[in-house]
Amino acid sequence: MVDQVKVVADDQAPAEQSLRRNLTNRHIQLIAIGGAIGTGLFMGSGKTISLAGPSIIFVYMIIGFMLFFVMRAMGELLLSNLEYKSFSDFASDLLGPWAGYFTGWTYWFCWVVTGMADVVAITAYAQFWFPGLSDWVASLSVIILLLVLNLATVKMFGEMEFWFAMIKIVAIVSLIVVGLVMVAMHFQSPTGVEASFAHLWNDGGWFPKGLSGFFAGFQIAVFAFVGIELVGTTAAETKDPEKSLPRAINSIPIRIIMFYVFSLIVIMSVTPWSSVVPEKSPFVELFVLVGLPAAASVINFVVLTSAASSANSGVFSTSRMLFGLAQEGVAPKAFAKLSKRAVPAKGLTFSCICLLGGVVMLYVNPSVIGAFTMITTVSAILFMFVWTIILCSYLVYRKQRPHLHEKSIYKMPLGKLMCWVCMAFFVFVLVLLTLEDDTRQALLVTPLWFIALGLGWLFIGKKRAAELRK
């Protein structure tokens, strides 16, 4: 794959079918931060808090710890060969063409499914202000807007993600500061609840639902981290990947502590975990509970922006994956063509059309949170597959190309050991998904995707990939 796709610097005249390196360090850092603050944090944290109580803090820390090492593996691999434009490329190079095919199409499907969840979330957030608003109106408006803006240039995507991420950062930092002030002032809500850190351990301790509740929090919590690997799809369009990628990946632990741990501590200090409504976003409900409806509208705008940001990332990454797959000969040739602005326009349009499946999902499952849970479970499973492929690629890389590892400027710490630890953790999460009815249904449906992919590779992909290599 890496021989088929070329990238050029911004100041060079682009050859036909070449991606341009238009994303600066500023874009990459904010894309990484925005990817780490997903819809799952805003939309799914209500359910995870109700399932696990304060122990959900440890759930997010554990998942974040594991994914940091997955990202370190991805970073070392991408920088070992700057012709790699994404993890689909090194999977194809190290594991074989089948791996690039499965990874590329699965990642495309991951983001389409995630985009559907974002459409569901956007619909819910829009109904906060307009209870009678049609699901179709809210969804179509956002999808058309994202399509139009992404058709412009890759730099436009970078700018959109920059400002989307800035809104999320300002909102979460503001929430943390306001929450800390409330705790310091012993603020009392209209219901008589006094803000206090003691809520974290006084109402049943750190593990009020026991180990079963603690384990139940992992499914939606995993979904909150999807998109953390997004910087890996920008490698071919980054001006200085050797500096930008390590900086973005190394900041992951700080982002997790700041945006996940601190925000959840504040939420459960102001609003006792037992009072959190699983069907609603606790970020919005926190301000409603303390009698600040105007602030609740602002936060609702922020979480709506977060969902739009996630959908924006999905539209970007899926179009790039389709472009790479088409270059490999395992996707329709039309997706391999770029517009005059070096944007894979046909891939963008196709992915946006697929996002409308989120609206269909709402009609199949009228419960917003029910539809969100089903979609996010499928997404979490597929993302774990992609993360596992990254780890497997790293193990093969260490075995077959030890000289590249020795020369690497960005070695993964505890490389081989942590690969196995992370994969064991993903198996553990899959086992947990069998415990709940709604997640079990999604777990049973997911293999159908891999069966369809396998048949596609057997009858079409394998032959086309071989012809292209000749």
UniProtKB/Swiss-Prot annotation:
The gene is cycA. GO terms for cellular component: plasma membrane. Gene3D superfamilies: Amino acid/polyamine transporter I. Permease that is involved in the transport across the cytoplasmic membrane of D-alanine, D-serine and glycine. Is the only transporter of D-alanine. Transports D-serine less efficiently than DsdX. In addition, in minimal media, transports the broad spectrum antibiotic D-cycloserine into the cell. Transports D-cycloserine only in minimal media, and not in a complex medium, suggesting that CycA does not play a role in D-cycloserine transport when E.coli is grown in a complex or biologically relevant medium, probably due to competition from other CycA substrates present in the medium. GO terms for molecular function: symporter activity. This is D-serine/D-alanine/glycine transporter. Pfam families: AA_permease. Belongs to the amino acid-polyamine-organocation (APC) superfamily. Amino acid transporter (AAT) (TC 2.A.3.1) family. Signal peptide: none annotated. PANTHER family: D-SERINE_D-ALANINE_GLYCINE TRANSPORTER, GABA PERMEASE. The keyword Transferase does not apply.
